């Protein structure tokens, strides 16, 4: 489904998604505490003072889905993004309860990026950096797109 974009719809999508998040985040926090899906401080990578619930991504994903279902029309790109997002949320949920090894997380990121690039049609054919225009030939353009998407997924996950 393709999102129908105009000023009114964009405002409504943002408002509804935000309101859903405001409602769902506290609920998922309580569920996370109940199932002990907590992020405990370790002094190495996690410097928070007290344990934090880890299931907030589910609330954000569900909020996104509500906005999408209310205002979207069918498109291969959006379907590929939804499939990839669902896969990432699913593995993130499992990781919140029982840690998933980094190599399996990276494999998941690859599958998600591959889905969006190959199935969804998101491909970087050229990039301009500091006035330099780089053009990527096939199949290098797909490889660069997948690497870029994996890097982006990892930046967001930090």
Stretch-by-stretch model annotation:
Residues 2-158:
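"…together with the soluble PPM/PP2C metallo-phosphatase catalytic core" -> "…together
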